Amino acid sequence: MTKPLTISQVQPKITLQWRAYFEMTKPKVVALMLLTVLVGMCLSVPGIVPLQPLVAGMAGIAMMAGSAAAFNHLIDRKIDGLMARTYNRPLPKGKISTTKAVTFAVSLGSLGFVVLYTLVNPLTAWLTFASLIGYALVYTAYLKRATSQNIVIGGLAGAMPPLLGWTAITNELHGYALLLVIIIFTWTPPHFWALAIHRRKEYAKVDIPMLPVTHGVEFTKTCILLYTILLAIACLLPVLVGMCGPIYLVGSTVLSCGFIYKAWQLKFHDYPELSMQVFKFSIYHLMVLFIVLLVDHYFWVNA
């Protein structure tokens, strides 16, 4: 006779499964994205952000972003199992079945949409839905496998969060929010290309046409350097239109110089670890840049 499972035996399995679901949402990526959402919200009003749209907006956008990440896991599950960086993900490892993953992704996205539509505003709900489709279907399912410019074109979906935060509070599209989108859109290619250089052989193995695979490492390094210069220019736009003050100007200039320096090192020095250094620096660059935007907004623009 088979012995029934005890609570002490069942609980670890449930915990592991929920950890797998949580991992599918790419929490670190979503956390950085939510920072840009929050900054978009704060910059949209001169004073304190209204609590209700702030909480509901952050929750709804987070759920739909997590859903998009889960769809990414689903679509990429076969190639993930062949790459060293991703073979340990829940689906390749069999921690979650495909059916359960689909149910989770659809449920999380639907709940997020309902929250945004009913508790925030329809504009934010539909824009977030468009971003989900852009990332999960247009980028992951098509562009990623179709062109070496996948990151450039598909980067628009990933650049939307500050605009979503802005519309969550104001219920309107504003030019200032679009400037923040331009910054992230320009930041995305050098960020991902640096990682792609480090993982070039893995991408080639699974036939993903990342730029280092199709055009070579040296060409990619040149593109990274050029894009960091373009990003430095994009980061000045909020100052040029009067959106930000000297705190942001100084902070963004220092960050831009640092990014250009790292890209210059990558281009002209042949150290294997430099590509990952650029990749990691780019994450800190975006995070600190948006924190500086927030500080400038409250301690200078509205002082």
UniProtKB/Swiss-Prot annotation:
Q: Which residues cross the membrane?
A: 29-49, 51-71, 96-118, 123-143, 150-170, 177-197, 223-243, 244-264, 281-301
InterPro entries in alphabetical order: Protohaem_IX_farnesylTrfase, UbiA_prenyltransferase, UbiA_prenylTrfase_CS, UbiA_sf
Major location category of this protein: membrane
One GO cellular component term of this record is: plasma membrane
One of the record's GO molecular function terms: protoheme IX farnesyltransferase activity
GO biological process annotations for this chain's record? Answer: heme O biosynthetic process
Query: Which controlled-vocabulary keywords does the entry list?
Result: Cell inner membrane, Cell membrane, Heme biosynthesis, Membrane, Transferase, Transmembrane, Transmembrane helix
Family, according to the entry, reads as follows: Belongs to the UbiA prenyltransferase family. Protoheme IX farnesyltransferase subfamily.
Q: What else is known?
A: Carbon 2 of the heme B porphyrin ring is defined according to the Fischer nomenclature.
Q: Could you tell me which HAMAP family the record lists for this protein? A: CyoE_CtaB
Kindly provide the name given to this protein in its UniProt entry.
Protoheme IX farnesyltransferase 2
- Which organism is this protein's natural source? Shewanella frigidimarina (strain NCIMB 400)
Q: What is the lineage of its organism?
A: Bacteria, Pseudomonadati, Pseudomonadota, Gammaproteobacteria, Alteromonadales
What gene name is listed for this protein? cyoE2
